[in-house]
A protein has these predicted regions:
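Structured alpha/beta or helical-core interaction and ligand-binding surfaces enriched in interleaved
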Residues: 1-163
């Protein structure tokens, strides 16, 4: 993986790893990208057992999952707690996700979704250009919405996990 002048892995190299992981997916397989621990927040877990008690909360990190569905790549980004999702996005972050092409899906649960290609597939599973667009969208989401750059911060890159 290439590195920036400080010796840290670069976002470009990280994106290349994600492209490779996506292109290697079999039908029904997925890769999940989990934000670094520094992006974790307290979120509600499970349902309430008694209505007068507050919901339990746990430290939760945002994630994006890319799943191969025949010739398409389906992207899911953890949904907003306010809409029944598992992460406490702020109103500004929700708007930023929408601006970056993610949209809530009433049919598929509380998560945000995107598809690549965003048109009719032109051939067998995902051309490299679409895999690169998907990786760039995930990187932009994690870099600009989840962990906006902080001057002087040396934040780690997100983890890429094969499901």
């Amino acid at each position: 993986m290439s590195q920036d002048p400080t010796g840290a892995p670069s976002w470009g190299a990280w994106q290349s790893l994600l492209v490779t992981a996506v292109l290697g997916l079999g039908d029904g397989e997925a890769v999940t990208v989990e934000a670094p621990q520094g992006a974790a927040r307290m979120a509600k877990t499970g349902g309430r057992r008694m209505p007068f008690l507050p919901a339990k909360r746990a430290l939760t990190r945002p994630w994006v999952r890319l799943t191969r569905e025949e010739d398409l790549l389906r992207g899911q980004c953890v949904g907003a707690e306010v809409f029944g999702g598992a992460f406490p996005w702020t109103a500004e972050e929700h708007a930023a996700l929408l601006d970056r092409g993610w949209h809530p899906s009433l049919a598929d649960g509380p998560d945000y979704v995107r598809f690549w290609p965003d048109d009719v597939p032109q051939g067998p599973f995902l051309p490299r250009a679409d895999a690169e667009r998907a990786a760039a969208a995930v990187a932009t989401t994690l870099r600009e919405v989840v962990s906006p750059p902080r001057p002087g911060a040396d934040d780690p890159l997100p983890a890429i996990l094969r499901s």
